[in-house]
Curated annotation (Swiss-Prot):
Protein name: MEF2-activating motif and SAP domain-containing transcriptional regulator
CC per GO annotation: nucleus
SMART domains: SAP
Gene: MAMSTR
Major site of localization recorded for this protein: nucleus
Biased composition regions of type Acidic residues, renumbered to the chain: 312-322
Entry function: Transcriptional coactivator. Stimulates the transcriptional activity of MEF2C. Stimulates MYOD1 activity in part via MEF2, resulting in an enhancement of skeletal muscle differentiation.
Motif (MEF2-binding): 12-28
Tissue: Expressed in skeletal muscle, brain, placenta and spleen.
Any one Pfam family match given in the protein's UniProt record, by short name: SAP
């Protein structure tokens, strides 16, 4: 089949299809003239004269494309009548909405408020006993919607208890979340959470609201409770500070008592002599010590007595009359370098509890070669100080001494 034959065949098919469509449209228009559609009004112009009278051009000239006849199809004609139909629906819908919004919602609210009123009047005596003490503290807006029935002036109105009993009875489940939140706001309770949480607060939340009020009223008589703990801690610290200040005024306690040669064994000896002078001042301070102050005291003892073990420091901490020299305030540097923390390096090994042995601290024999200054000299690259007289400790060292000059050079580096 050639290309010309295929194109000719397609033209014939198209012309036949057009002729069939035009014939159907003509027959439909003829039926509309004989039996007019009730939707079409009589004032519309006639559709028939717009069509040609003869059918010959539709049937016998299939190849010619005629202009589309000017007529309105039946599915387009109701558009002129659509405004009337839409007006009917527009008039009916607002009526339904108005009646629903104006009349329907007040019915369950009026019923739910009238029924608990009857229940409250039936319950009677338990109502005033529950709310008798709290009526004077209720806010005024809560009292306005409650009186629904007029009462004689001589009789006190029982309307507030039924209104509050309504919120404590069966009708709690019927209330919406917004109404529950509104009632919780009136009672001063939190309004966040699910409906079950709100119902639990409504059932058992009103009496706890009155419990913290006596605390607020009684709080001006005493100290306010948020500031009570810091004041107590400050007072305990002030009382605890009497002990180091009293120890600083003692003349018989020399700084040489800290040296490893004499060892910390002689340090408890002046304690019985000065014990009666310290008992009235350090007694309340030691009784009021907290965990934080105990830790600070242990750190201070570890800094002042590097040759003593941790067990000895903790045991001496229980005794409040143990004499200790005060912390030198002019010592160059922070105490974090000297504190026996496991994370610190270098200098922390000087004050660790594993270096001095308990035999060394209890006997006046010459000191162990692994002493604090030996470690410092080993770190700084100097010769060991095992031979020779025992030098004083870090806190009693003389800055002009040539043997301890390397120590201060080493300690100045981190700062």
């Amino acid at each position: 089949m050639t290309l010309a034959a295929s194109s000719q065949r397609s033209q014939i098919i198209r012309s036949k299809f057009r002729s069939v469509l035009q014939l159907r449209i003509h027959r439909r228009n003829q039926e509309q003239i004989s039996d007019p559609d009730p939707w079409i009004s009589a004032s519309d112009p006639p559709l028939a004269p717009a069509l040609p009278s003869g059918t010959a051009p539709f049937l016998f000239s299939p190849g010619v494309l005629l202009p589309e006849p000017e007529y309105c199809p039946p599915w387009r004609s109701p558009k002129k009548e659509s405004p009337k139909i839409s007006q009917r629906w527009r008039e009916s819908k607002p009526r339904g909405n108005l009646t629903y919004h104006q009349y329907m919602p007040p019915e369950p609210r009026q019923g739910s408020r009238a029924d608990p009123q009857a229940e409250g009047s039936a319950l009677g005596p338990p109502g005033p006993s529950l709310w008798e003490g709290t009526d004077s503290q209720q806010p005024h807006p809560r009292m306005k919607p409650s009186p629904l029935t007029p009462c004689p002036p001589g009789v006190p109105s029982p309307s507030p208890p039924p209104h509050k009993l309504e919120l404590q009875t069966l009708k709690l489940e019927e209330l919406t979340v917004s109404e529950l939140r509104q009632q919780l706001r009136l009672r001063g309770l939190p309004v966040s959470g699910t409906k079950s949480m709100l119902l639990e607060r409504m059932r058992g939340g009103a009496p706890p609201r009155e419990r913290p009020k006596p605390r607020r009223e009684d709080s001006p008589a005493g100290a306010p409770w948020p500031r009570l703990k810091p004041k107590a801690l400050a007072a305990a610290r002030r009382q605890g500070s009497v002990k180091p200040s009293a120890a600083s005024h003692r003349p018989p306690l020399p700084r040489a008592a800290d040296t490893p040669g004499t060892a910390p064994a002689p340090t408890p000896t002046p304690a019985p002599a000065a014990a009666p002078a310290l008992t009235p001042s350090s007694g309340p301070g030691s009784a009021a010590l907290t965990l934080e102050e105990e830790l600070q005291e242990a750190i201070r003892r570890a800094q002042l007595l590097p040759n003593r073990g941790i067990d000895d420091i903790l045991e001496d901490q229980v005794e409040p009359d143990d004499p200790l020299p005060p912390i030198p305030l002019d010592f160059p540097g922070s105490f974090d370098v000297l504190s026996p923390s496991p994370d610190s390096e270098g200098l922390s090994s000087v004050f660790s509890s594993s270096l001095p042995s308990p035999t060394n601290s209890s006997s006046p024999s010459p000191r162990d070669p692994t002493d604090s200054l030996d470690w410092l000299e080993a770190l700084s690259g100097g010769p060991p100080l095992g031979s020779g007289p025992p030098p004083p400790s870090i806190f009693s060292a003389d800055l002009s001494d040539s043997s301890s000059s390397r120590l201060w050079d080493l300690l100045e580096d981190p700062w």
